[in-house]
Amino acid sequence: MKRINIALAGLAVVVMFTGCKSLYGKYERPDVNTQGLYRDPVSLTDTLAVSDTTSFGNMPWRSVFTDPQLQSLIQTALDNNVNMLNAALNVKMVEEALKVARLAFLPSVAFTPQGTIAKFDDNPVTKSYQLPLSASWNVDLFGNLLNAKRSAQMQLLATQDYQTVVKTNLISGVANLYYTLLMLDRQIEIVGEMEGLTKETWEKMQVMKDTRIGYRSTAVQSAEAAYYSVQAQRIDLQRQVREMENSLSLLLGQPAQTIQRGTFEGQSLPQDLATGVGIQLLNNRADVHAAELTLAQCFYDVNQARSRFYPQITITGTGAFTNQNGLVNPGKMLWSAVGSLVQPIFQHGQIVAGLKVAKMQYEQAYNTWQNTILQAGNEVSNALVQYNSAAEKAEFDAKRVEVLKKNVEDTRTMMSQSANTSYLEVITAQSNLLNAEISQVTDDFNKMQAVVNLYQALGGGAK
């Protein structure tokens, strides 16, 4: 034991002069530039200014999506979605791996009882037994176990963040599909109204053909075709509704079914869409945070790879109760203690290659982290421009709808009062009005979708 103590003391001195800082160092965030991380397009309202310090992404999801039916759907998805369930299992698996890394600091203990019965010729039967209890302790003088534990801790935190990523993606996915259904419902209503209007126009033209001399049958045919076109458009929208319901049911972890929902006009989303400063994405976005934790994990993997160049020190002790003849008196205790030191000299290049690979994996993790930050900024920029463009376009579409409604009314009146009005003017006016009203609903939906996408891009949904 005295020799072991001397060896340990000598190695401790060696550690002091061989850069133990590189073996025990803790991860520190590298420099990252978040200036101009996302664009600040000229917004239509002051609520879109990105200079605010409070981020829209910090709001709880129930405060953002206040529709009770949507809240119920989101909660169902969080409880039943397969990806959410698997993400939770991944966290539990990594937790078990961390427990193993922590227990590695403790001695390993083994109990290996043995018994022997022997008989030679006419000699009496001899019975012997041995009840050994052995313990082996790896002295973590060079940080191998410490860095393995820290790496496992980072892996656990990163896995928990990925679970949050799944949650935020699921919330935004359910919300977008829900609002898509509401948009389609409203468009079906508009098409239904236009269906009645085009049918009425067709019937009027039929009467005019029968009562006016020289009224062409082509006008009636065009009006009839316009009516059928609107009917076909309604069927197409109904198909899209069924597809959206099927997709939403899949996110809910349920068979395809009819989705209970509110109305498009009854939706209310927050108007304060402050994005906060770019550095907040490093804390709010779970995927950005997870990417940095993966970088930290690789940092500790590099430390662990360096520690393999140093000796491995193991202390082993054994105690046994035995009656083996020739060793000790029957029923006595046997004790032994051994200290061993293994210094790698030639490992076929495995240790050197392991360190090089660990360093390259660290560089890859750093690049991935940087790219994740850029991608987050890109998503924020896209959501902002989507909201602004939809809001700006909605103003023009609203004016267009107002003008076209009057145009339809005027052309219908003129058609019934004068033969100078072409049937094409009536049909064209109705078609233009339908397209404008559909576009107006799409604009409102795009604003809703932009709010959902911005909320997700800012890390919303974690709370």
Predicted features and spans:
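Terminal intrinsically disordered/low-complexity segments used for targeting and assembly
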Residues: K2-D79, Q238-N283, A457-K463
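Small/polar, glycine/serine/threonine/aspartate-rich low-complexity segments that form flexible
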Residues: D40, T47-T66, L70, Q75, ...
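Transmembrane beta-barrel architecture of outer-membrane proteins
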Residues: S72, N86, S128-Q130, N176, ...
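Sec/SRP-type N-terminal targeting helices
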Residues: L85-N86, R102-L103, V139-L170, T218, ...
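Periplasmic alpha-helical coiled-coil/stalk elements that build and connect Gram-negative outer-membrane
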Residues: M154, D161-V277, Q386, A390
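Short segments within alpha-helical structural elements
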Residues: E195, K199, S229-Q257, K399-L458
